[in-house]
């Protein structure tokens, strides 16, 4: 099996979700099933809705969960928010730390 490609969703108040969506639409289907986004599922879903982007999402709890071949796979990291583009700095720092910590653990596992 080919190695997975892990991408951190990044700063919630930025344009990262838009970049992820545009890139997702341009890559081929063979590559899509290897990509996993580390971020908050509800946040990305809300941002896509506001930006009027229609990409199907698949929430996964663990890196070894079966990834969907045609949906954007999101490894869910907890984050509380009311407005998906106006999140408090304190919550952002904690969220980004958890995302990087998760990515670091995955890289140590060599998945």
Task: Give each language-model segment a name.
Residues 1-111:
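Contiguous, glycine/small-aliphatic-enriched amphipathic segments in soluble metabolic enzymes
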């Amino acid at each position: 099996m080919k190695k997975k490609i892990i991408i951190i969703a990044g700063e919630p108040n930025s344009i990262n979700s838009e970049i992820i969506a545009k890139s997702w639409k341009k890559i081929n289907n063979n590559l899509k099933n290897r990509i996993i986004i580390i971020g908050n599922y509800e946040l990305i879903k809300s941002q896509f809705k506001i930006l009027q982007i229609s990409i199907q999402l698949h929430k996964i709890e663990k890196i070894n969960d079966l990834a969907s071949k045609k949906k954007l796979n999101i490894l869910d990291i907890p984050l509380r928010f009311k407005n998906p583009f106006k999140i408090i700095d304190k919550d952002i720092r904690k969220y980004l730390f958890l995302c990087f910590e998760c990515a670091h653990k995955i890289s140590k596992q060599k998945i």
